[in-house]
C-alpha cells in the first residue's frame, strides 16, 4: 500500500516503487449454494469476508450490528489464521443475535455467490495493507463500508461509505443509514465496479511490473 511505501521512506529513507494489487470485473452468480446452506438471498445480508483476526475490527462490527434495527443478516465468512480462540470469542459475542451467521472458510462458487448477492460488503479494519478483498468486493458491484484508515479510504475514495475506525457508534449509525436508505446503497453499487476496475486494472498492473523489470535489467 502507499502507507507501507511512506513507512519505508520515513523509517529507512528508502525510495520504493508502488505497484498495487489489480482486479478485473467479476461475473455475478445467482444465490444457489448460499440459499441452500444459509437461507441467503439477494440483498438480504451484510457481508464481511476475510480472516478472523482482531485487527480486522470484527468485534466492532458485531457490537454495532446488534444495535441495528433491520431484518438483514450479518454474514461473517472466513477462517482464523492462528488459533480458534478469537473465533470463539466472536461467536460468544454474537450468540444472542440469530441474524449473525458464521460460514467458516469459503472458496469457489460459494465465495462468488456471497460477493455477488450482498447488500453491503464491510471491512471495518484497524490495520490493513492493500486489501484485495475490498477490490474484489467492489469488482462485484458492491456498496462497501470501510473504516477511515488510509489503506481503505485511499482505495475507495468517495465511492463507498466510511466510518471512524474503532468507533462502534459511528459504525452502527452508518449501518443503520444504509439499511434505511436502499437508494444510497444502490448508488454506490452502480458505480463500484467501473470505478475499481478502472483504477486497479490488472492489465495496467502487469504493464507497470514488466516496465520495472525492463528498467532494472
Task: Show the residue positions of the predicted features.
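Carbohydrate-associated surface elements
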Residues: 3, 22
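A short, well-ordered alpha-helix in the C-terminal region of glycosyltransferases
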Residues: 184-199, 208
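Conserved donor-binding/catalytic core segment of Leloir-type glycosyltransferases
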Residues: 39-56, 62-66, 75
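Short, structured helix-loop element that forms part of the nucleotide-activated donor/catalytic region
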Residues: 6, 73-99, 110
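Aromatic "clamp/platform" in nucleotide-sugar-dependent glycosyltransferases that forms part
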Residues: 126
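Short alpha-helical donor nucleotide-sugar binding micro-motif in glycosyltransferases
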Residues: 105-106, 113-118
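Conserved acidic donor-binding segment of nucleotide-sugar-dependent glycosyltransferases
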Residues: 161-169, 177-183
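Short hydrophobic beta-strand element within catalytic cores of glycosyltransferases
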Residues: 143-146
Amino acid at each position: 500500500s502507499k502507507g507501507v511505501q511512506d513507512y519505508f521512506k520515513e523509517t529507512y529513507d528508502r525510495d520504493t516503487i508502488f505497484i498495487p494489487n489489480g482486479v478485473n470485473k467479476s461475473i455475478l452468480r445467482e444465490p444457489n449454494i448460499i440459499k441452500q446452506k444459509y437461507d441467503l438471498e439477494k440483498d438480504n445480508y451484510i457481508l464481511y469476508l476475510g480472516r478472523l483476526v482482531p485487527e480486522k475490527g470484527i468485534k466492532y462490527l458485531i457490537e454495532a450490528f446488534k444495535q441495528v434495527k433491520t431484518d438483514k443478516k450479518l454474514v461473517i465468512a472466513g477462517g482464523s489464521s492462528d488459533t480458534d480462540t478469537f473465533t470463539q470469542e466472536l461467536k460468544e459475542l454474537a450468540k444472542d443475535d440469530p441474524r449473525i451467521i458464521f460460514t467458516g472458510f469459503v472458496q469457489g462458487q460459494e465465495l462468488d455467490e456471497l460477493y455477488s448477492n450482498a447488500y453491503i460488503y464491510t471491512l471495518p479494519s484497524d490495520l490493513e495493507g492493500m486489501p484485495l478483498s475490498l477490490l474484489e468486493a467492489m469488482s462485484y458491484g458492491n456498496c462497501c463500508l470501510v473504516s477511515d484508515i488510509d489503506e481503505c479510504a485511499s482505495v475507495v475514495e468517495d465511492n463507498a461509505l466510511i466510518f471512524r475506525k474503532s468507533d462502534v457508534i459511528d459504525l452502527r449509525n452508518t449501518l443503520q443509514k444504509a439499511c434505511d436508505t436502499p437508494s444510497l446503497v444502490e448508488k454506490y453499487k452502480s458505480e463500484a465496479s467501473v470505478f475499481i476496475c478502472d483504477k486497479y486494472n490488472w492489465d495496467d498492473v502487469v504493464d507497470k511490473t514488466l516496465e520495472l523489470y525492463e528498467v532494472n535489467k
